[in-house]
């Protein structure tokens, strides 16, 4: 459907020449036929599963490649961006020269020239005042399918005068042979130019680079306008009460916000402005490893026609083995948000959040399943962003390792972490919001805290019973822990009880406390950061 009659001439403006044909904003039926075309080879080819969803493989790139991320350093970004080569903070915002950018752009536009291309126009951001109009250009049908699922699909009327604010050119099939001379990490690249407002992708087929690329852009633009930009899921209760769930990949954002008792706003990326919380996306990107119909029925039932599975094992009879992590632990599915029945309609936005939940998967088994945070502890734990990096969401990670990721999303932050903390705190104070730290990870038994217990904890937060519960303080971390909660095994609330002896917990807790203190040193170069030290662990 060529609503705005995009022509090869239009693509010439981006340096893409001699385009054979443009498949503009293809329907799901068109994408289905394109992906299953028997003439396709390699990673372009989709496989039909018995659930109705198409499955694709993304090759060796089964997660993002943060070491291959670059941003052009110019007058727009020089003094605003959080650069990897400045300050104490560790991040992936490596500077790129204008010359190298032009070389990468030439590679991608050459790759896309002379081809039959898929062009998808979509929105990033459910708030019309601040959303980005994004044009995605790719030669691969399933990549067009991915962005159609994940971003907000414009109406026919909105497409008539669609003018892109940002262009994403995906040249997954091309690589950069001159990477060594240019001082880059590898032949693959995910590069941004915030002056030209273009993202380039080369070498990696992973769909998540397009999703998280736009998240990085929103993370640059919104906080500068005083709008919180958050790596979180969000939902709303029957009384209009909004909760947001911060957390890194695999900590439970999608699972815990997909709740039959509450309507989903979104599962991963949100803004918080003067009107309330709004989704950046039009879809969900759920992990499927060990997915079961019983434990996560909403996500399981969302995997049907128009959903797109990534890197799962499909048996000869078309059934999916969700337990098989042989390709990667980071198996995924993208689906349009309306595949979940219980969502906020027609626009994925709601009022101001009153509950802010920080999800962590503690591989040490030290932190309690839930604690109520003071205002200073809220800032401390937001800036710390502690979790265990779970297997598979980045290449080369197979065992859980502790990690600190500022604002529970350092990989996607374009500004200094304190800028996100300042905006979030202002929004929380204005809304009278309360924060909680929820450990969805392990305890002294060596087992992961069950989804059943975690869901009961979330229920207690959302219905207010946790705020009324009697609490005690956990030593070292000074966290307020409830003595009992409805539906939760009381023995697990105090993590010390899950160890053979309190000394075992003390030993592990001391080791983790040291890591927290070392990590937070990077924020102590400002008076505001120094003031927060007392909100962290004390040895």
Curated annotation (Swiss-Prot):
Q: Where does ATP bind?
A: 212, 231, 247-255, 296, 332, 448-449, 454
Q: Name one GO cellular component term.
A: cytosol
Q: Which cofactor does it need?
A: Mn(2+)
A biological process (GO) of this protein is:
gluconeogenesis
* Name of the top EC class for this enzyme: lyase
Q: What does the note accompanying the cofactor annotation read?
A: Binds 1 Mn(2+) ion per subunit.
Q: Which UniProt keywords apply?
A: ATP-binding, Cytoplasm, Decarboxylase, Gluconeogenesis, Lyase, Manganese, Metal-binding, Nucleotide-binding
Write out the annotated subcellular location.
Cytoplasm
Quote the record's binding site residues for substrate: 64, 206, 212, 332
UniProt binding sites for Mn(2+)? 212, 231, 268
Q: Where is the signal peptide?
A: none
Pathway assigned in UniProt: Carbohydrate biosynthesis; gluconeogenesis
EC number, UniProt record? 4.1.1.49
Q: Name one GO molecular function term.
A: metal ion binding
**Is DNA-binding set as a keyword in this record?**
no
- Which reaction(s) are listed as its catalytic activity? oxaloacetate + ATP = phosphoenolpyruvate + ADP + CO2
- Which Pfam families does the protein's record reference? PEPCK_ATP
As for family, the record states:
Belongs to the phosphoenolpyruvate carboxykinase (ATP) family.
Q: Which PANTHER family does the UniProt record give?
A: PHOSPHOENOLPYRUVATE CARBOXYKINASE (ATP), PHOSPHOENOLPYRUVATE CARBOXYKINASE ATP
Q: What is the annotated quaternary arrangement, including any partners?
A: Monomer.
Q: What does this protein do?
A: Involved in the gluconeogenesis. Catalyzes the conversion of oxaloacetate (OAA) to phosphoenolpyruvate (PEP) through direct phosphoryl transfer between the nucleoside triphosphate and OAA.
This protein is called Phosphoenolpyruvate carboxykinase (ATP)
Organism the protein comes from: Salmonella arizonae (strain ATCC BAA-731 / CDC346-86 / RSK2980)
Q: Gene that codes for this? A: pckA
């Amino acid at each position: 459907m060529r609503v705005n009659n995009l022509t090869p001439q239009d693509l010439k403006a981006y340096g893409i020449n001699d385009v054979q044909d443009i498949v503009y904003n293809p329907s799901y039926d068109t994408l289905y036929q394109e992906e299953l075309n028997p003439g396709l080879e390699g990673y372009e080819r989709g496989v039909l599963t018995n659930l109705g969803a198409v499955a694709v493989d993304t090759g060796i790139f089964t997660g993002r490649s943060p070491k291959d991320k670059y941003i052009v350093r110019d007058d727009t970004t020089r003094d605003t961006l959080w650069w990897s080569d400045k300050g104490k903070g560790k991040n992936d915002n490596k500077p790129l020269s204008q010359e190298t950018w032009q070389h990468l752009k030439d590679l991608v536009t050459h790759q896309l020239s002379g081809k039959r291309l898929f062009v998808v126009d979509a929105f990033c951001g459910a708030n019309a005042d601040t959303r980005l109009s994004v044009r995605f250009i790719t030669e691969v049908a399933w990549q067009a399918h991915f962005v159609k699922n994940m971003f907000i699909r414009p109406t026919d009327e909105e497409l008539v005068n669609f003018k892109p604010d940002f262009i994403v050119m995906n040249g997954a099939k091309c690589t950069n042979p001159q990477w060594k001379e240019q001082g880059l990490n590898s032949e693959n690249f995910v590069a941004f130019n915030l002056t030209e407002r273009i993202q380039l992708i080369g070498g990696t087929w992973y769909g998540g680079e397009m999703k998280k690329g736009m998240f990085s852009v929103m993370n640059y633009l919104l906080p500068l306008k005083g709008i919180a930009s958050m790596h979180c899921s969000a939902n709303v209760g029957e009384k209009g009460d909004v909760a947001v769930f911060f957390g890194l990949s695999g900590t439970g954002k999608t699972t815990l916000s997909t709740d039959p008792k509450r309507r989903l706003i979104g599962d991963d990326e949100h803004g918080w402005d003067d009107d309330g919380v709004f989704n950046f996306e039009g879809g969900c990107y759920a992990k499927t490893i060990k997915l079961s119909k019983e434990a996560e029925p909403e996500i399981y039932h969302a995997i049907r026609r128009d959903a797109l599975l990534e890197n799962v094992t499909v048996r000869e009879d078309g059934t999916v083995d969700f337990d098989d992590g042989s390709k990667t632990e980071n198996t995924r599915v993208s689906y349009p948000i309306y595949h979940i029945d219980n969502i906020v309609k027609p626009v994925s936005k709601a009022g101001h959040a009153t509950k802010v939940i920080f999800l962590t998967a503690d591989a040490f088994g030290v932190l309690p399943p839930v604690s109520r945070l003071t205002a200073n502890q809220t800032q401390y734990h937001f800036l710390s962003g502690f979790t265990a990096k779970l297997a598979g969401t980045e290449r080369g990670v197979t065992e859980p390792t502790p990690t600190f990721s500022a604002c529970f999303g350092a990989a996607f932050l374009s500004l200094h972490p304190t800028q996100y903390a300042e905006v979030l705190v202002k929004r929380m104070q204005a809304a009278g919001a309360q924060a909680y730290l929820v450990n969805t990870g392990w305890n002294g038994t060596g087992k992961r805290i069950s989804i059943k217990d975690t869901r009961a904890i979330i229920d207690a937060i959302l219905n207010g019973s946790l705020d009324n519960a009697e609490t005690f303080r956990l030593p070292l971390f000074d966290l307020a822990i409830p003595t009992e909660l409805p539906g939760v095994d009381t023995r697990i609330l105090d993590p010390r009880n899950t160890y053979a002896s309190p000394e075992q917990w003390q030993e592990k807790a001391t080791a983790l406390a040291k890591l927290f203190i070392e990590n937070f040193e990077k924020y102590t170069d400002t008076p505001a950061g120094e003031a927060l030290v007392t909100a962290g662990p004390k040895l």
